[in-house]
């Protein structure tokens, strides 16, 4: 029977059909090769937006710097970064006037955070630029390396101290005449493989000491490493993102803490909230504007787009904002917060890996590292690359480009939101002093603007005034990409509003699926995704039931765990059939062991092992939940785990799911090939940390330490703890006299070894 597809929509309001218009299934595009070109684009574009600024030279590093602040007032609609300090300060003052005490209170909250934050806060986060090795590392490793270098250079660095003390070390390190660092180097040699008798390249890694003079150290400390942003949909060209080193991170963290605290108190801010809370905020603003405009006024909404938001922002402007926000605060606090923007005004962008050349005829490939771009003959490059390199050359120092203006992607999201909101705040009638007024929402670079006025001319005048006010602080609304509708229809941060929010369920489609890493986690994540979408995205009961059945079907294929009584033949079916036949209570088998599906939409919140526990055969229970089962490298699991799910649009989201420790929750073993690479030394360090931490936590179960605290003190702490515990256990009769004596002997031996060392 042919179905006329339009019939499907007869009962559906038009706006609910948005899910059918989203093409985001399948894998998003990833970038390959080098990001050098994209980074040069960013640097060149940023300078172009500020080209009429003043050039100066940094006295410490010799880097040429462009300062567009208080530059020419705009005469056309071209995007520009010439923010006017007095305008920014005035916007801040008005923001404070309409929210009495907001800055004061946020400063007090932040001051408390500054005094309490420990340095291990910096171990959170993903890849970080490790300035000692000049490449990205996991955050914890990069921090450890930084602290190790600080300590060997006579600074008091301590992994368990306060973050503020670490930042004092950072400041001191910048005053030092030279810094000695430990870097890795590779030796390659050709050797004959005994097994295959072929020639292979063997790499060995050595560590060597290297001295950096003040200039070289400062350049490294101020460097942001760049990469290509992956998995961006809907774009033809890739773009560069930056990751700062450990010197900058701590300062940025405190500035963002202050800005976050301010954003939480602003009704127009789309950050730091997300999801349903964000929708409620937006709905409130829309409701307010519509209620006020019922009879006499017109109300229009602009779904806005800004041109290169962060390339037109300026760290010097952020410094002015912070100076104003903290003006009545103690000197030390103002200093701590002003360092991040100062470092950003002097930042350097690392150009990445450089270019790869290959000659098809000679089968040769060669890498031109970024350091060589300053001197290499340009005849080897195509025209567009040649232009880029010519333009960037005056800015190059040691393979990094001086980049004073602009903010790089994703650095001061909260603080730039405060700036955006301060312009929205100026739309109140008491400030516009005319018949039109505006309000709206700002979330980083995304905004929605609602303008009310008695007639169309008023609306136009309002939009125009908003546009020009934005220009004065370095915000450039893209006229071509912003569109205006009657209030009630708009889009903000990929939420579509039409008389209320339209659930765009297709955005979540990519996160439905089975990743094939771990049977226990996959089952739990799968049902949690369905549960969450029923709560948040209007996933109706019938569709959810269908999604669930499809999910179970999907789940059985990668793990080859079709029901024990199925006819489907797979590699596992022989074993699973045998298990099925010898199990008395077949309903108790997990799906991954060929059991039936226990789920329906009523019990999605219960982990599968819990649902089936009462139904299981006793010996199956014993095998399934046995931490001593030797065939599984067993993972201790907290009751809640975090999974990363990828919606179609926007950043990867972290999602909590229940984790029950069964023999089906395993950790994949590390890929062996890493052991032959330059990463091997780092891997060994990491494993060493891991072992120390695990040991330490056995002694101090409530331990909040995540990393060793200077070797001697840690060992001493564990030894003394062992002695105390042993004495208590001996006196209460839990251990025998011989065991007690043995423990004491071991403790003395450890101390003796420590002394000999």
Curated annotation (Swiss-Prot):
Post-translational modification remark: Phosphorylated by host PRKCA.
Enzyme Commission number(s): 2.7.7.48
Entry's family note: Belongs to the influenza viruses polymerase PB1 family.
Entry GO MF terms: identical protein binding; nucleotide binding; RNA binding; RNA-directed RNA polymerase activity
PROSITE patterns in alphabetical order: RDRP_SSRNA_NEG_SEG
Biased composition (Polar residues): 55-64
Compartments where found: Host nucleus; Host cytoplasm
Catalysed reactions, semicolon-separated: RNA(n) + a ribonucleoside 5'-triphosphate = RNA(n+1) + diphosphate
Described function: RNA-dependent RNA polymerase which is responsible for replication and transcription of virus RNA segments. The transcription of viral mRNAs occurs by a unique mechanism called cap-snatching. 5' methylated caps of cellular mRNAs are cleaved after 10-13 nucleotides by PA. In turn, these short capped RNAs are used as primers by PB1 for transcription of viral mRNAs. During virus replication, PB1 initiates RNA synthesis and copy vRNA into complementary RNA (cRNA) which in turn serves as a template for the production of more vRNAs.
Domain RdRp catalytic, first and last residues per copy: 286-483
Taxonomic lineage of the native organism: Viruses, Riboviria, Orthornavirae, Negarnaviricota, Polyploviricotina
Highest taxon of the lineage: Viruses
Segments carrying motif Nuclear localization signal: 187-195, 203-216
Record-level GO cellular component terms: host cell cytoplasm; host cell nucleus
Pfam (any one): Flu_PB1
Keywords: Eukaryotic host gene expression shutoff by virus, Eukaryotic host transcription shutoff by virus, Host cytoplasm, Host gene expression shutoff by virus, Host nucleus, Host-virus interaction, Inhibition of host RNA polymerase II by virus, Nucleotide-binding, Nucleotidyltransferase, Phosphoprotein, RNA-directed RNA polymerase, Transferase, Viral RNA replication, Viral transcription
Gene expressing this chain: PB1
Protein name from the UniProt record: RNA-directed RNA polymerase catalytic subunit
Residues covered by region (Promoter-binding site): 249-256
A biological process from GO: DNA-templated transcription
């Amino acid at each position: 029977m042919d179905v006329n597809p339009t019939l499907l929509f007869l009962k559906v309001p038009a706006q609910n059909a948005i899910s059918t218009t989203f093409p985001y299934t399948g894998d998003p595009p990833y970038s390959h090769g080098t990001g050098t070109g994209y980074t040069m684009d960013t640097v060149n574009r940023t300078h172009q937006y500020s080209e009429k600024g003043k050039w100066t030279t940094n006295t410490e590093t010799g880097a040429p710097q462009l300062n567009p602040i208080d530059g020419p007032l705009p005469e056309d609609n071209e995007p520009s970064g010439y923010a006017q300090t007095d305008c920014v300060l005035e916007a801040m003052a008005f923001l404070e006037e309409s929210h009495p005490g907001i800055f004061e209170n946020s400063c007090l909250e932040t001051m408390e955070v500054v005094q309490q934050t420990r340095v291990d806060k910096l171990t959170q986060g993903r890849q970080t630029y490790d300035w000692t090795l000049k490449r990205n590392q996991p955050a914890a490793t990069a921090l450890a390396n930084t602290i190790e270098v600080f300590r060997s250079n006579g600074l008091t660095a301590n992994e368990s101290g306060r973050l503020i003390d670490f930042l004092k070390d950072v400041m001191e390190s910048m005053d030092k005449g030279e810094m000695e660092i430990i870097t890795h180097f590779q030796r390659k040699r050709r050797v004959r493989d005994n097994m295959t008798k072929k020639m292979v390249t063997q790499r060995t890694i050595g560590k060597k000491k290297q001295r950096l003079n003040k200039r070289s150290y400062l350049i490294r400390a101020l460097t942001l490493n760049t990469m290509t942003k992956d998995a961006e949909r809907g774009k033809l060209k890739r773009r560069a993102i930056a990751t700062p080193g450990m010197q900058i991170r701590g300062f940025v963290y405190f500035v963002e803490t202050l800005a976050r605290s301010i954003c939480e108190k602003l009704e127009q801010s789309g950050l730091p909230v997300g999801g349903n809370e964000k929708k409620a905020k937006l709905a409130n603003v829309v409701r307010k504007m519509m209620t006020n405009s019922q009879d006499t006024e017109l109300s229009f909404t602009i779904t806005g787009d800004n041109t290169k938001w962060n390339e037109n922002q300026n760290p010097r402007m952020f410094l002015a904002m912070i100076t104003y926000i903290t003006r009545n605060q103690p000197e030390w606090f103002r200093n701590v917060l002003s360092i991040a923007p100062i470092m950003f005004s002097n930042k350097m962008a690392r150009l990445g890996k450089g270019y790869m050349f290959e000659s098809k005829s000679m089968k040769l490939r060669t890498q031109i590292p970024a350091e060589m771009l300053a001197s290499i003959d340009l005849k080897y490059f195509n025209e567009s690359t040649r232009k880029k390199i010519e333009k960037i050359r005056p800015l190059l120092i040691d393979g990094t480009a001086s980049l004073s203006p602009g903010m790089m992607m994703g650095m001061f999201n909260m603080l730039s939101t405060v700036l955006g909101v301060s312009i929205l705040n100026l739309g109140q009638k008491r400030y516009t002093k005319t018949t039109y007024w505006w309000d709206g929402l700002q979330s980083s670079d995304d905004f929605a603007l609602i303008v009310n006025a008695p007639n169309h001319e008023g609306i136009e005048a309002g939009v125009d005034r908003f546009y020009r006010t934005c220009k004065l602080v370095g915000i450039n609304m893209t006229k071509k990409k912003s569109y205006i509708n009657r209030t009630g229809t708009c889009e903000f941060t990929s939420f579509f509003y039409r008389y209320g929010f339209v659930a765009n369920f297709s955005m979540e489609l990519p996160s439905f699926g089975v990743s094939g890493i771990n049977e226990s986690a996959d089952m739990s994540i799968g049902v949690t995704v369905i549960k969450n979408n029923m709560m948040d995205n209007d996933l109706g009961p019938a569709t959810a039931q269908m999604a669930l059945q499809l999910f179970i079907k999907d789940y059985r294929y990668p793990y080859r765990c079709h029901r024990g009584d199925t006819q489907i033949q797979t590699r596992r079916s022989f074993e699973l059939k045998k298990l099925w036949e010898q199990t008395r209570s077949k309903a108790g088998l997990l799906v991954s062991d060929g059991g039936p599906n226990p789920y329906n939409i009523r019990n999605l919140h219960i982990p599968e092992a819990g649902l089936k526990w009462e139904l299981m055969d006793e010996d199956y229970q014993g095998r399934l939940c046995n931490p001593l089962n030797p065939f599984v490298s067993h993972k201790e699991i907290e009751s809640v785990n975090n999974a990363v799910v990828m919606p179609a649009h926007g950043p990867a989201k972290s999602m909590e799911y229940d984790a029950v420790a069964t023999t089906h929750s395993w950790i994949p073993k590390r890929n062996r090939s890493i052991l032959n690479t330059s990463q091997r030394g780092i891997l060994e360090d990491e494993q060493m940390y891991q072992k120390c931490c695990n040991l330490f936590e056995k002694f101090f179960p409530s331990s909040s330490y995540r990393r060793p605290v200077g070797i001697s003190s840690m060992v001493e702490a564990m030894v003394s703890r062992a002695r105390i515990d042993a004495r208590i256990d001996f006196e209460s009769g839990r251990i025998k006299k011989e065991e007690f004596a043995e423990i004491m002997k071991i403790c003395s031996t450890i101390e003796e070894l420590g002394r000999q060392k």
